[in-house]
């Protein structure tokens, strides 16, 4: 097909398909590069909607949001403006797993985005469905929509979330629909299959929502929180002045009886669902079956907006019929007279096999075509936003003829996320966990800014001035560490008496003790917390940095792109199959592919060495 037609008045630099959390980050990344962008979405009033829980952050996820902010993304800033509650998680478990979680006013979040995007000069927002990608010689050059519109562009980013050929499932009902009753379509799914892409069916779910006025709060536990002086964004000056509470209750024996009695009516257990659900966010039916020995399960009431008129019932995700949901809900303390605002449901949808992707999130099959978010088999707003940002950055790099930006595993959870997807793939919705990161002592909540700074600068998402400001912050911390190593506390000092010191020690050693409040030593130093973490974890950080350097060396060992793996002697059949499918670029990537063992890597290294020797001998 010709790249020019009567419908083509403008060739855009990029088209972003889908206005969810991934799509929004992609759009902003492209706009920061001063590129012309089209955003195609179903409903511009539901940009970055939250069809599941109204929250951002949590273990590992909160660190991802900090990384997004440090990389030049918007999720952290928007969350700070729309939050109605914010807190630390895992405070007692140490700084390596410390994370922020915030309850978000979901309506305000979407409104803030739309208001800001309307101001952007190089952006066109279209409400439509995509029906076909325009591809010629394995390169995308635009797309067609359901409304017969044609757009031409140098690159396309698909961020369709859970909307591709999706079905909402409740009991025996399977309704073609996207989340929150939005439109679905199989047009793009069919088009991707025609182009040769491997798709898979995945499933997720959501709980019922309850009118707050129908809840008996005398029977539930109120979460009382202090006002934390914290934010997701490193630049944000907005502070939450008042915390809005969430509430805790539990399922009962009656709840479990109703679920067990009606298990066959659940879409999940009736055989209606073929997609694989998220392992770490099971439905209430799954919990009752898999953990039958537990007498009760936690249920949290989370307000969806500042108005607090509707509560999200966290922990009660279900695909039961409406009558069973109502019966089930009324057995939970506090919900005896509950009125359901929206029933829970499961949703099944098409997703891409992420082994189809490069680390840049460009597809291997079609040049200039990028994928990000839940279409890549992930779950969660944070994972989606991170991918959208990386896809937006690299689509911009593609347009500008620059090298892609690829974040290493030792530099960020974003790097871990993408590396896992493109080397291991996933057969279930992938959720980021701290346990997935082998360098988590380095990938902390407090140092996301310095970890992402070089990538943000390379991407053009922060200025040289902003970059130097971050570098200056850590130079200041290093100078203060040196000062503290030369300053001592003697047993006669007031500080020594407070901490029962019997001998003279340096302030640096004292601040590294876990029971010492760093403010006693650094009352006026603005980066006291960061310094204290670095001092306390120094030995562990050095060890992980050393391990990371070994990984980096493997990343520098390139595998020839044209390598014929069938000629590599003594490879296991599984390694041969995986290498041919994934086509890793480096030995480091190859070593992380599931099913590949150290012997396979040795054989691969030996084969590459022989090839190099043969090339030299021919010269």
Curated annotation (Swiss-Prot):
Stored SMART domains: GIDA_assoc_3
Q: Record-annotated residues binding NAD(+)? A: 277-291
Gene Ontology CC annotations of this record: cytosol
Recorded GO molecular functions are: flavin adenine dinucleotide binding
Name where it mostly resides: cytoplasm
A Pfam family hit: SAM_GIDA_C
Q: Please provide the record's keywords in A-Z order.
A: Cytoplasm, FAD, Flavoprotein, NAD, tRNA processing
Q: Which cofactor does it need?
A: FAD
Q: Which PROSITE patterns match?
A: GIDA_1, GIDA_2
Q: Where does FAD bind?
A: 18-23, 130, 185, 374
GO biological-process terms attached to the record? tRNA methylation; tRNA wobble uridine modification
Could you tell me the superkingdom of the organism this chain comes from?
Bacteria
Where does it live in the cell?
Cytoplasm
Q: What is the protein's known function? A: NAD-binding protein involved in the addition of a carboxymethylaminomethyl (cmnm) group at the wobble position (U34) of certain tRNAs, forming tRNA-cmnm(5)s(2)U34.
Its subunit composition reads: Homodimer. Heterotetramer of two MnmE and two MnmG subunits.
Q: Which HAMAP family match?
A: MnmG_GidA
The similarity comment for this entry is: Belongs to the MnmG family.
The family database entries (NCBIfam families) matched by this protein are listed as: mnmG_gidA
Q: What is this protein called?
A: tRNA uridine 5-carboxymethylaminomethyl modification enzyme MnmG
């Amino acid at each position: 097909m010709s790249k020019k037609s009567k419908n083509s008045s403008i060739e855009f630099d990029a088209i972003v398909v889908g206005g969810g959390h991934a799509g929004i980050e992609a759009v902003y990344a492209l706009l920061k590069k001063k590129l012309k962008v089209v955003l195609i979405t179903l409903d511009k009033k539901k940009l970055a909607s939250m069809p599941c829980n109204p929250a951002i952050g949590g273990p590992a996820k909160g660190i991802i949001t900090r990384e997004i902010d440090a990389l030049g993304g918007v999720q952290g800033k928007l969350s700070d403006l729309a939050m109605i509650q914010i807190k630390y998680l895992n405070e007692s478990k140490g700084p390596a797993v410390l994370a922020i979680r915030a309850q978000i006013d979901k309506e305000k979040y979407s409104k803030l985005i739309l208001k800001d995007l309307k101001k952007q000069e190089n952006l066109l927002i279209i409400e439509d469905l995509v029906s076909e990608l325009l591809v010629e010689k394995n390169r995308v050059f635009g797309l067609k929509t359901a409304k017969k519109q044609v757009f031409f562009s140098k690159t396309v980013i698909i961020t369709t979330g859970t909307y591709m050929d999706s079905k909402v499932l409740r009991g025996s009902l399977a309704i073609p629909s996207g989340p929150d009753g939005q439109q679905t379509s199989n047009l793009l799914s069919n088009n991707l299959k025609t182009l040769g892409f491997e798709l898979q069916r995945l499933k997720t779910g959501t709980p019922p929502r309850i009118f707050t006025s129908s809840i008996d709060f005398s029977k539930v536990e109120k979460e009382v929180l202090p006002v934390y002086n914290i934010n997701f964004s490193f630049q944000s000056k907005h502070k939450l002045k008042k915390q809005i509470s969430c509430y805790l209750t539990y399922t009962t024996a009656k709840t479990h009886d109703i679920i067990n009695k009606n298990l066959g009516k659940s879409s999940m257990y009736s055989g209606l669902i073929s997609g694989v659900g998220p392992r770490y966010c099971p439905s209430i039916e799954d919990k009752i079956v898999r953990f039958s020995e537990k007498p009760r399960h936690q249920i949290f009431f989370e307000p969806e907006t500042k108005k607090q008129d509707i509560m999200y019932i966290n922990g009660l995700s279900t695909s039961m019929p409406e009558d069973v949901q109502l019966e089930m809900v009324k057995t939970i303390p506090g919900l005896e007279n509950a009125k359901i605002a929206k029933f829970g449901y499961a949703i099944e949808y098409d997703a891409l096999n992420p082994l189809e992707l490069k680390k840049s999130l460009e597809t291997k099959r079609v040049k200039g075509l990028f994928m990000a978010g839940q279409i890549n088999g992930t779950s969660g707003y944070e994972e989606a936003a991170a991918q959208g940002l990386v896809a937006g950055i690299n689509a911009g790099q593609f347009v500008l003829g620059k090298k892609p930006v690829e974040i290493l595993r030792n530099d960020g959870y974003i790097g871990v996320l993408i590396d896992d997807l493109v080397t291991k793939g996933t057969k279930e919705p992938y959720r980021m966990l701290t346990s997935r990161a082998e360098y988590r002592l380095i990938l902390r909540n407090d140092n996301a800014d310095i970890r992402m700074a070089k990538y943000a600068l390379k991407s053009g998402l922060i200025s040289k001035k902003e970059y130097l400001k971050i570098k200056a912050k850590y130079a200041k911390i290093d100078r203060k560490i040196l000062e503290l190593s030369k300053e001592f506390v003697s047993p006669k000092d007031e500080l020594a008496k407070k901490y029962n010191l019997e001998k003279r020690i340096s302030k640096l050693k004292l601040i590294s003790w876990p029971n010492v409040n760093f403010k006693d030593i650094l009352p006026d130093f603005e980066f006291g917390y960061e310094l204290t973490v670095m001092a306390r974890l120094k030995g562990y950080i050095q060890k992980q940095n050393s391990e990371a350097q070994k990984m980096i060396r493997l990343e520098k060992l390139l595998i020839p792109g044209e390598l014929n793996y069938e000629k590599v002697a003594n490879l296991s059949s599984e390694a041969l199959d995986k290498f041919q499918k994934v086509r890793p670029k480096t030995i480091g990537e190859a070593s992380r592919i599931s099913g590949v063992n150290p012997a396979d890597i040795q054989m691969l290294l030996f084969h590459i060495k022989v090839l190099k020797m043969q090339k030299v001998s021919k010269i």
